[in-house]
């Protein structure tokens, strides 16, 4: 089965979108839009997670999908990591509801904070086996896993699949560029390295993604796309709006032409290996050829025991297995530490040279933030610290 286009670049000299075509599901014809709205049987208000998925479908970030997965595709993805056409997918893209009356063939008007964003044309509705989904996608049924807890406690009883007709993107506190907009900013015929994060960027992160441009499998004159997720994450994470403000301040402070910035309205699942695959698919649609992946990417700890749900290299190993089929490459993140003698170097080099390693734990950092104590510049950018203190 042929899963990908054989060409390595599109007409603009960039990696082609996943499946070969960047989908744009936004309807511009006002008559068609009004007709779809008039034929909608139901009106559902989207949760923030739902709204993120609707937006990513509309702009083509989930290409080649043209809507929420139906039952057959859902089952195929959770069991095989592939849709029914054989394309790799890390996690199912589904719409949830408690409405018992909705049936195939009907249309649902989707709103977000009362804004009419899309119509979902239902072709499939089912009651999923959430225990099976949790076990296959997250490796556990424990409610101590944030996504498993979300599936059981937040999602509705039913899943709904069907074509999405987009009207307008959700109005957010932070602007998120579409794949088409990001692609227009990228250089032709050069590697584009994606850096994913869900927290404010500190010095170690900066060193990590700038060092990635020097990796053996990254060509010269390449760029890095810093592409943080600004949607829902874990309960104790910093709010998306605050994270966005730290990124904007840092973008101005760094002002490096090798670094491109965009923000992703994605809802984190903390699914470890499967989420690494999902992130790579999305970043390919945004024009990235490489993906930085480090220890315990998209991992999480049990809320009761504090134990990790995934091994430190599970995500990295799984991503490496999928990379060729995705026409992408992974860039392992180095374990960087700060030394008095030489600044940021690898932990292995610091140990070999017997250099003194400077450390500041997350707990200590937050304490200094709260108490207004000085934070060393080797650890955090002043602009980022200022935003966090104001918030």
Regions found by a protein language model. Give the residues of each.
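Active-site cores that bind ATP or allylic diphosphates and position pyrophosphate for catalysis
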Residues: 2-391
């Amino acid at each position: 089965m042929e899963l990908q286009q054989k060409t390595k670049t599109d007409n603009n000299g960039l990696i082609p979108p996943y499946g070969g075509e960047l989908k744009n599901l936004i309807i511009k014809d006002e008559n068609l839009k009004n007709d779809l709205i008039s034929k909608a049987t139901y009106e559902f208000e989207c949760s923030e997670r739902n709204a993120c998925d609707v937006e990513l479908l509309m702009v083509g970030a989930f290409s080649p999908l043209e809507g929420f997965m139906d039952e057959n595709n859902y089952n195929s993805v959770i069991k095989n990591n592939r849709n029914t056409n054989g394309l790799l997918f890390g996690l199912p893209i589904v719409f949830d509801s408690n409405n018992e009356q909705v049936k195939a063939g009907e249309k649902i008007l989707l709103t977000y904070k009362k804004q009419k964003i899309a119509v979902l044309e239902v072709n499939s509705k089912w009651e999923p086996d959430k225990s099976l989904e949790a076990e296959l996608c997250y490796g556990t049924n424990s409610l101590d896993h944030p996504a498993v807890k979300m599936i059981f406690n937040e999602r509705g009883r039913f899943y709904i699949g069907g074509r999405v007709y987009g009207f307008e993107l959700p109005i957010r506190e932070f602007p998120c560029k579409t794949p088409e907009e990001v692609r227009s900013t990228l250089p032709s015929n050069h590697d584009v390295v994606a850096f994913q994060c869900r927290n404010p960027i500190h010095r170690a992160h900066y060193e990590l993604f700038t060092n990635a441009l020097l990796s053996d499998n990254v060509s010269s004159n390449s760029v890095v796309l810093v592409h943080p997720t600004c949607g829902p994450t874990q309960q104790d994470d910093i709010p998306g709006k605050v994270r966005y403000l730290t990124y904007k301040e840092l973008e101005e402070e760094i002002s490096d032409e090798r670094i491109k910035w965009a923000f992703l309205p994605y809802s984190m699942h903390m699914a470890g290996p499967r989420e690494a695959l999902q992130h790579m698919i999305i970043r390919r649609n945004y024009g990235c050829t490489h993906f930085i992946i480090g220890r315990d990417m998209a991992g999480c700890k049990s809320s009761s025991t504090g134990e990790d749900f995934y091994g430190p290299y599970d995500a990295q190993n799984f991503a490496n297995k999928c990379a060729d089929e995705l026409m992408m490459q992974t860039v392992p993140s180095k374990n960087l530490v700060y030394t008095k003698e030489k600044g940021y170097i690898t932990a292995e080099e610091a140990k070999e040279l017997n250099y003194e390693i400077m450390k500041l734990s997350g707990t200590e950092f937050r304490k200094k933030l709260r108490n207004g104590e000085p934070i060393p510049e080797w650890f955090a950018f002043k602009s980022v610290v200022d935003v966090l203190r104001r918030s």
